[in-house]
Amino acid sequence: MNDEFKNIIESLIFASDEELSVKQISDILGSFNKPISATEIENIIDKLNFGYKANGNAFRIIKVAGGYQFATRKEYAFFVG
């Protein structure tokens, strides 16, 4: 996995107020001359989630309404309302 792409995708999803679709992520990266396929984006998101789970993070990236966003894992959702 390309760490630069991983960090960019993670940052985009984290900073977004709304879910981001694979196309939106691809378009943003493409506008910076960093083309990436939909499959690569989805693989990176899967690997990010694997790392979050392995590290015991309280959050993950979920697919919602055709896009991706950060969410608190259900066992911690009670604490954040």
Q: Which residues make up each language-model segment?
A:
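Conserved, well-folded catalytic cores of nucleic-acid-processing
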Residues: 12-15, 32, 51
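Short, positively charged loop/turn segments that connect secondary-structure elements
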Residues: 30-41
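A short acidic, leucine-rich amphipathic alpha-helix
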Residues: 24-28
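Phospho-regulated, low-complexity intrinsically disordered regions of nuclear gene-regulatory
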Residues: 1, 9-12, 71-81
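Positively charged, polyanion-binding regions of nucleic-acid-associated proteins
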Residues: 2-19, 45
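Charged low-complexity interaction tracts in eukaryotic proteins
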Residues: 5, 43-77
